[in-house]
Swiss-Prot record:
It comes from Homo sapiens. The keyword Glycosyltransferase does not apply. The gene is LRRC26. Isoform 1 is expressed highly in normal prostate and salivary gland, very weakly in colon, pancreas, and intestine, and not at all in other tissues. Isoform 1 is expressed highly in many cancer cell lines and in breast cancer, pancreatic cancer and colon cancer. Isoform 2 is expressed in cancer cell lines. InterPro entries: Leu-rich_rpt, Leu-rich_rpt_typical-subtyp, LRR_dom_sf. The lineage of its organism: Eukaryota, Metazoa, Chordata, Craniata, Vertebrata. Disulfide bonds join C43-C49, C47-C57, C205-C231, C207-C253. SUPFAM superfamilies: L domain-like. Residues 320-334 have a biased composition (Low complexity). This is Leucine-rich repeat-containing protein 26. Auxiliary protein of the large-conductance, voltage and calcium-activated potassium channel (BK alpha). Required for the conversion of BK alpha channels from a high-voltage to a low-voltage activated channel type in non-excitable cells. These are characterized by negative membrane voltages and constant low levels of calcium. Pfam families: LRR_8 (PF13855).
Length: 334
């Protein structure tokens, strides 16, 4: 009688032993490699990536945006590097990016097409750089943008065309720049804006500040910030808070052209409009002169005549008047 045989279960047991830890090995291999070169093909090689689409490339002294960006990226941290300029298509391939951090890079140049393809971007941080100007259309592709920080740059002027129409933008940080006023029409293209950070700028309290003050009356700043948004000129208004100015304070400022007037200028053209304006001025001056002359004539007609002088003055040359009976001419006539 043969004893029990274990030859048949052994292959099955070995197979179970080999297969049982496989999910653990797979999980370890997928999560233990932080860089793109070790198990994360959608991550730039020099960066550290974590599940959820976050790529951290902070403080690596990078001179440019690293290659290898993919559609799986949701957040890209490039702060504290040396990215001095953003060329066209700098973030090609990252069309699903929602957050982009470019703080403290010494950035001084942004190409007008640098952000093309980032239609899903919601947060853009360009603070603490060296930007002095932004080309028209720079942010035009960012239709989903909700938070934009330009704080701590060297911006002396911000044109409406640079921001473009950002219908979802809710927060705009402009503090610590060199802004004396905001260009007319800039805030009007940001219908969802409800947080505007302005402190640390040399605001000039003149007529150019009227649109900003009107916006601040509709969207009051927090008390802590309202006390720090101050005028630096003219002298009599130095250190006056912007929130203290009512619309009556700008009553001496010329009103901008209405839409109807702008439509007339556009239809006629600049040259034709100037000719028409000169003709209207000449016609108005002529009518005013005619009315003044008519008024003088009417006043003269209503004035009573002067009575005759009973004692006329003698002729200044010593000659007798023809009506004087003692004159030689009167004697000859007699």
């Amino acid at each position: 009688m043969r004893g029990p045989s274990w030859s048949r279960p052994r292959p099955l047991l070995l197979l179970l032993l080999l297969l049982s830890p496989w999910p653990v090995w797979a999980q370890v291999s997928a999560t233990a490699s932080p860089s793109g070169s070790l198990g994360a093909p959608d991550c730039p090689e020099v960066c550290t990536c974590v599940p959820g689409g976050l790529a951290s490339c902070s403080a690596l002294s990078l001179p440019a945006v690293p290659p290898g960006l993919s559609l799986r990226l949701r957040a890209l941290l490039l702060d504290h590097n040396r990215v001095r300029a953003l060329p066209p298509g700098a973030f090609a391939g990252a069309g699903a990016l929602q957050r982009l951090d470019l703080r403290e890079n010494g950035l001084h140049s942004v190409h007008v097409r640098a952000f093309w393809g980032l239609g899903a971007l919601q947060l853009l941080d360009l603070s603490a750089n060296q930007l002095e100007a932004l080309a028209p259309g720079t942010f035009a592709p960012l239709r989903a943008l909700r938070n934009l920080s330009l704080a701590g740059n060297r911006l002396a002027r911000l044109e409406p065309a640079a921001l473009g129409a950002l219908p979802l933008l809710r927060s705009l940080s402009l503090q610590d720049n060199e802004l004396a006023a905001l260009a007319p029409g800039l805030l009007g293209r940001l219908p969802a804006l409800d947080a505007l950070h302005l402190r640390g700028n040399p605001w000039g309290c003149g007529c150019a500040l009227r649109p900003l003050c009107a916006w601040l009356r509709r969207h009051p700043l927090p008390a802590s910030e309202a006390e720090t948004v101050l005028c630096v000129w003219p002298g009599r208004l130095t250190l006056s808070p912007l929130t203290a100015f009512s619309d009556a304070a700008f009553s001496h400022c010329a009103q901008p052209l209405a839409l109807r007037d702008l439509a007339v200028v556009y239809t006629l053209g600049p040259a034709s409009f100037l000719v028409s304006l000169a003709s209207c001025l000449a016609l108005g001056s002529g009518l005013t002169a005619c009315r003044a002359r008519r008024r003088r004539l009417r006043t003269a007609a209503l004035r009573p005549p002067r009575p005759p002088d009973p004692n006329p003055d003698p002729d200044p040359h010593g000659c007798a008047s023809p009506a004087d009976p003692g004159s030689p001419a009167a004697a000859a006539q007699a």
